[in-house]
Every structure is written in structure tokens, then in C-alpha cells.
Amino acid sequence: MTRRLLIAACILTLCVPALALAQPAAARLTILHTNDTHGHLMPFSYPAIAPAGSALEQMTERSNIGGMARRAALAQKIRTEQKGRGIPVWLVDVGDFCDGTPFSTEYKGEADMAAINAAGYDFATFGNHEFNNTLEQVRKLLGQATHPILLANAVDRATQKPLGQAWRVEKVGGVRVGLFGMVTREAATYPAAKEGVDILDEIKTATVTVQTLRKQADIVILLSHGGEDMDKRLAAEVPGIDVIIGGHSHTRLPVGEFVWRGDDLKQNDINGTVIAQAFQWGGELGRLDLLFEKDASGVWRVSRYRERLLPITQDMQAEPMVAAVVDRFWQPIAARFGEVVGKAAADFSSRGDDEAPYNLVADAVRETYNVEFEMENTGGVRAPLVAGDITRADLVTLDPFDNRVILFKATGTQIKDLLARYAPYVSGLRYRLVDGQVVEATIGGRPIENDRTYAGATNSYYAGLALRDISQENTGRMRLDVLTGYVKDKGTVTPAYDGRRVVIGQRRRDGR
């Protein structure tokens, strides 16, 4: 008996190292990601000819792309394929699903959230445009989500507690993966934040959160609605972030980016941060395949990655349940927003500094109110127009904000200062800006006189930003209504590429 026990003990002793060796030395994870979808629940098209050097020019498919139901079907297909290989798949969104189409303007994010839920998203964060609602509506959207909303740096002003979930840890094979989410500090200027939300500094919040996560996670992933520049800063300045899935800057990163950290490159340690971002509107689905391995010291690292942007094309099947959700929200508004209000003689797109959609809006307001000039902020016009019929939905997608027309009078000196500070899009005015200095400016074909007062117009957002010291009159009329009336009256509108705005050197951004 004693001999049998001894033999058994020896066998167990021999087996223990073998079992330890059998523990997984690697794990894989696939992350499917979207950002800045801005209400594009249905398929859409870009202009046929893309601006030279633009992200659009890189895209292989630009016509009849995207749509939440197709996206969900593609994600489901990839989940099934990866499940057969034993690889988990996460579907994540990095915010700004609001503000962009009639779905957003009519349902304040609820149609988007219902579709996101139906598509089976696993995690998400909010962007600044989700805060372009009331605080009550933001809380409602948080409550409607069937997946965790990660928001470490958006806290209730009264309680200083995160609006969503600050962070969480998930198990992927034998690897503990920590996740957290953040929104750009620009969100602090939006209505919901002004009501009662503090948007904390991204670098400080990330530093504290990563320190907390590193005590209980092997890998750290950030869902960052902060833009490409901020993501690079976070990667460089906050040790311990392995992956950043980004948004906000509408950057198209076909193979991702990598920010190196340090010079001591070890085997199985890429020693830095992977950054991914999938442009905008859900025309493509980002796919990031990650391999986790232990380094020589037994620490889990991201040892390999592969990032791709998968086109969502018209030949793809739609997921029926998601399609039904989208249709449920579309049908009540289809007749109104499907109405054809005019025609575009050609694509309204970009050619250098000439932005035909901005020129259309600026011309519409200036001509309607018979003022000498009009100004529009960068970021205030959100989409091109494709040649052919123009529907109300097209104009809402171009101008999705609740902006009112503002009339004001300004001296030539004040106008030149506005041009230098904000490089706005214009009508009735032509100018040339070099390294932030106005070198040429005319109104009505004549040089601007510094002491003369001119009658102008703009939108309420830009007025609040730039015209604080200039008296102004709010007409109360929505810019979108002015634009719609203008297109109806014209019948057919033609894009203007006339060199009215030339900006050389540093560009000043003031938009959303």
C-alpha cells in the first residue's frame, strides 16, 4: 500500500510541471470597431470623385456603402468564423453616433442606440455629440444601452461619479484584459455637460485609471473619443496602454498606427501602443486582430497585431432583426425626409480649400438675408451632396445642427480679425490667409476698408464662439430651413469652386 502511494506521489510530482507547461502561452482576440457613425443607420454614398489626397480617395468602395444591418451581418459572420477557431470577438463603438442624419435629429440618439443594441455591440464609449442633448437624454441613452458604456472622464458634477462605467476587466483565455473609455474635453462645451457633467483631463484620468487597471489586468485597452493627436499623446505619455481604439478626428487608418515607447525591444514585446480608427459613418468596419504572448519575464504583451478596414458593400446581406429596428424608426419619418426638394447639377465636394457644401450654405444665407457677407465655421457643415436628386434627408445630413441665423455688423478690422483667428468659410467675401495673417481680403470685389461697417450673417454656434464682443440679432430661423428654401427656389444648384477662401500654413479649427 505504501509502495503504491509512493508511486502515485511520484507520478503526480512528474505531472505537475507538465500541467504547468500545458497552460496557454498565448491568446488571441479580435476587436471589430466603429466610430463617428453620426446617425448613418442606412446605406449612403460619397461623391464619385474623391478629393485628391483625402481619406475618401483611399477607399475602394464609396457608393451605396455602410448601413447598420449590413454591418451587423458582417460582424456576425466574423464572430462565427472566429468562434470556430476558438477566438473571441468584441464589437465596440467609440462614440458620436448622434448628430448627422434625420435619425439623430428626430430621435436624439434613441434610434441609434436601439440599432446598436440589436447589432450586439459588446462595449462602447460616448463622444462629444452624445452630449449635444439634454443631460436627461444622455442619462436615458445610458439606461437604454444593453452593453457597458465606458466613460472614465465624464463625471456627474454633484457626485463626481462616472456617468457610465469607468473601467472593467474581461478574461480572454488566460489573459485579463482591462478596458476603459474617455471622451474629448471638447464635450464640456456641449449642452448636457453644461447642465451638470464635468469632463476631466484625458491624460490625468488615463494615468490614474491605468494604474488602477494594471493591478488587476495584464493588458489595457482604451476606447478613446479624443482624436488622433490625443491618442498619440496618450500612447506616448501614459505608460501601460497597449491598444487605443480611437474616434473623434474621423481619421482613416487602414493598417493602424504604432507609437513606440522606449528603445529596449525584447522578444514578444512590441513595446508600445497600437492605435486604430475607422474613419466615419460606418462605411467600413475596423478589424483589429491581436495576439497576446508572455515575454521572457512572464508578463503578457501584445506581440502581434493586424488592423484592416473592411468595406461594407451593397452585395452584403442585411441582418434581418437589425434591419427591422432601423425600418421601425425610419417609416414614421420617411415621407417627410424622403421628399425631393431640388437637384444637384454635380457633386458638392472639396477641391483644395474650396468646399462646395460650405459655399452652398453660406450663399444661401447671404442671398436670403441680402447681407454683404456670410461666415461659416469649420465643422459646421457635415457632408457632401451627391449629384442628382436632393432630399430633405440629404440636407439634414449636410446640416444636422440646431443652428439659427444670426445677423450682425462689423468693421473691416473686426472682419479681418475673424478671418485670421478662425479661417471661416464665406460668401460675398474673398480672402487669402498665410500663416495666420490676412494678406488679401475683399467684400463685393473691393478691398475691405478697416473703418467701414459691413452687414454680415452667420450661424448661432459661430456667433457664440467668435462674435462675443459684436452686437448681433438672432433671427430665430433655423439655418437648415433657409438652406431648404434656397434649394427649392433654385430648383437646381451647382457647386461653386471659385477660390473664395485660400488658407496657407497653419489652419485654425473651431468646429465640431
Can you say where each PLM-predicted feature lies in the sequence?
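Acidic, metal/ion-coordinating pockets
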Residues: 22-314, 321, 352-364, 405, ...
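Short, compositionally biased low-complexity segments
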Residues: 37-47, 303, 331-342, 389-393, ...
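Alpha-helix initiation and N-capping motif
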Residues: 135, 318-330, 334-337, 341, ...
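Bacterial N-terminal signal peptides that target proteins for export
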Residues: 1-8
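Bacterial N-terminal signal peptides
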Residues: 8-18
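Flexible, glycine/charged-enriched surface loops at secondary-structure junctions
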Residues: 88, 220-223, 336-342, 372-378, ...
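Hard-cation-handling environments
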Residues: 298-390
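Feature captures C-terminal
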Residues: 27-30, 40, 50, 146-153, ...
